Amino acid sequence: MLEITVERNEGYVLCRPSGELDAYTVAQFREAVAGLADERFILVDLSYVPFMDSAGLGALIGGIRRARENDGDVAVACDRPSLIRLLHTTGFDRIVPVRETIEEAVLALGDPDAV
């Protein structure tokens, strides 16, 4: 089961999925991210996601595409070594800033040199 919380903060929206992000839960995540399409800056906190497969990664990439089409941007906060390794191995961290803390990810939002 995947739970998703959305918090609106000054300057960005925090999307925090909690639970496995995989083929079984990806539709719920896609829907949540699609609901944020009008937001300028989105920070996705993956710290509560113990597992993510290619479906979850694809949903993240789709959210990035939509945000950038609307002149926005996305950053990811994640302190889980297994997910950081996945994001690095797939090259995801070359298109989006991936930082260990929310604070670091917020600083990277909108900074073209942050990736």
What are these regions (language model features)?
Residues 100-115:
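A charged, well-structured terminal subsegment
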Residues 5-7, 77, 99:
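General small-molecule cofactor/ligand-binding pocket signal
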Residues 1-3, 11, 71, 95-96:
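A generic structural signal for alpha->beta connector loops
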Residues 2-31:
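STAS-typified acidic loop motif
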